[in-house]
Regions:
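Conserved C-terminal guanine-recognition region of P-loop GTPase G domains, centered on the G4
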Residues: 31, 65-66, 82-92, 285-355
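Conserved nucleotide-binding/hydrolysis micro-motifs of P-loop NTPases
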Residues: 12-16, 47-49, 81-84, 106-109, ...
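Alpha-helical coiled-coil heptad-repeat register
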Residues: 124-127, 131-134, 138-141, 162-165, ...
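N-terminal accessory targeting/assembly segments
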Residues: 1-108
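Canonical P-loop GTPase G-domain recognition
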Residues: 96-114, 120-122, 128-149, 337-378
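Switch II of P-loop NTPase G domains
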Residues: 23-26, 49-65, 270-293, 304-318
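Conserved G1/Walker A P-loop phosphate-binding module
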Residues: 148-246, 259-274, 278
Length: 378
């Protein structure tokens, strides 16, 4: 399949630090590569405030359109959340040239669509899409109304708006009803596990930190792993046996893994990202319930990432939004094989409260120490 040619635009304030601007653009590049696009031009624009009509301003927009025509660009991606009228106004200027215009959420939704395997994931993406695209569709209906209605008349476009709203409202209710069935099934499974005495451990982390790799390394589950963002959208659950010398965990309890051991359930789900839009968090809330109700959280961190600390904070912000603040956490610093020297002492000091463990899922290093920490925490 041919790669679509893409222009990337990021609009930042004049107060944005160069390092932060660089990071924002790097992440947008990673998202675009994950989607499968070929980046031909990257543009950073500094503005005090976004342009009301087109976000990037008329002069810059004309410049971008000229470049897009010259470079035979198929998609313009703006690394911000645009208002419906802003993206609508840009689309009107480029639609005859065959160029698509996406904002940051459009791009993430396209990646989600590419990676969705289960019916539930597809439903969640559709729900997020309706919530994101709905206002834009209303804007299109309003434009039809203004064109068809004339002065002092009630045009067919106005009826179109109402029809669109009703259609999307009915579809949203139907999707939420189907998603709730999956959520109820998961709730019943959790209740059964609680009754049997199973402990649950949830793996969270920034996307591409190595969550699925950790699940595979600990349980041999065989979850899909790829060096790209959002490779995993669905919740995967696997059993992990923890050897223990503690006499309290010996015996014939159904949740025990035999003499001197404990079986726990390990779950892995969608990765987080900088400025993860609220509607996406809400759409995936049912699959994130495993994290909300876990007895222990393993926060997987790419220790070789130059933006490691910022990404730790962003994952914690999402957990706070999910109201996961009191659950015990272990920080699992992954990919130690990517560094010649890992600053263990400094990391242990900074994140002492989260019992840091250093591992390489790729080389199966540090996993026994992690198992011990999990057993001790539980």
């Amino acid at each position: 399949m041919d790669q679509p040619r893409v222009i990337l635009i990021d609009v930042i304030s004049s107060q944005t630090k160069p390092e932060e601007a660089k990071r924002r653009l790097l992440e947008l590049e990673s998202l675009t590569h994950t989607y499968g696009g070929m980046i031909v031009v990257k543009i950073i624009q500094k503005r005090v405030t976004p342009d009301y009509k087109t976000y990037i301003g008329p002069g810059k927009l004309e410049e971008v359109i000229a470049i897009a025509e010259q470079e035979q660009v198929e998609i313009i991606i703006i690394n911000n959340l645009l208002k419906p009228h802003q993206i609508f106004n840009i689309e009107r200027m480029v639609e005859r040239k065959g160029i698509k215009v996406w904002d940051r959420i459009d791009l993430i939704l396209k990646i989600f669509q590419k990676h969705a395997d289960t019916t539930e994931a597809k439903l969640q993406i559709r729900l997020a899409g309706i919530r994101h695209m709905g206002p834009r569709i209303y804007r299109m209906g309003l434009e039809l109304s203004q064109q068809a209605g004339g002065i002092g008349t009630r045009g067919s476009g106005e009826t179109n708006i109402e029809q669109m709203k009703r259609h999307l409202a009915v579809e949203e209710r139907a999707i939420k009803k189907q998603i709730s069935k999956y959520a109820n099934t998961r709730s019943l499974h959790r209740a059964r596990r609680d009754k049997m005495g199973f402990k649950t451990v949830s793996i969270v982390g920034y996307t591409n930190a190595g969550k699925s790799s950790l699940l595979n390394a600990l349980t041999k589950k065989g979850a899909y792993v790829a060096d790209e963002l959002f490779a995993t959208l669905d919740t995967r659950v696997a059993k992990l046996w923890l050897p223990s010398n503690d006499p309290l965990v010996k015996g014939g309890h159904p949740a025990k893994g035999g003499i001197g051991g404990l079986s726990v359930l390990l779950s892995d789900t969608i990765g987080f990202i900088q400025d993860l839009p609220p509607q996406l968090i809400q759409a995936f809330r049912s699959t994130l319930e495993e994290t909300v109700h876990a007895d222990l959280i393993l926060h997987v961190i790419d220790v070789s990432d130059q933006y490691m600390d910022e990404k730790i904070n962003e994952v914690e912000e999402v957990l706070a939004e999910l109201e996961v603040t009191d659950t015990k956490k272990i920080y699992v610093f992954n990919k130690i094989d990517n560094l010649k020297r890992v600053p263990r002492t400094a990391i242990k000091k900074k994140y002492k409260a989260f019992k840091p463990v250093f591992v390489s899922c790729k080389k199966s290093e540090g996993l026994e120490e992690l198992k011990k920490q999990i057993a001790d925490s539980l």
